[in-house]
Amino acid sequence: VAKVIEVAPIRVYEVATFYSMFNRSKVGKYHLLVCGTTPCMIRGSREIEEALLKHLGVKRNEVTQDGFFSVGEMECMGCCVNAPMITVADYSNGSEGYTYNYYEDVTPEKVVEIVEKLRKGEKPPHGTQNPQRIRSGPAGGNTTLLSDPKPPPCRDLDAC
């Protein structure tokens, strides 16, 4: 790659090791990436990863014997408000037709459920996994800015 684009090999290596979507070793048909940044960690991403590894019987970056699954870590996915979350890189249509789907508000039980649906060939709905959340809104609905704000006490600044 470095020769083709005429850059130093270290530059290619830097990019390939920085971005988690570049796989430098074999991954499963479904590569499960657990968010490893602070908001997701606070909300339980380590427990999510442990549940996946235990259920699949692999270590991080290993591929299951059937070749279907691998588990890795990914840095911020940009949906911190819906932490914790995972990405499923779906290579079932080959490396040229892959998709990335975000599963937000996941629990250890929910990620196992997602894995089992994928194993059966089903496509679990992506996005929030919390039925009480509407898109990125708070679970249970808004709690602030429910009405028009009060006007300032004095509209005529010259009179104040």
Predicted regions and their residues:
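Signature of N-terminal electron-transfer/Fe-S-associated modules in redox systems
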Residues: V1-C160
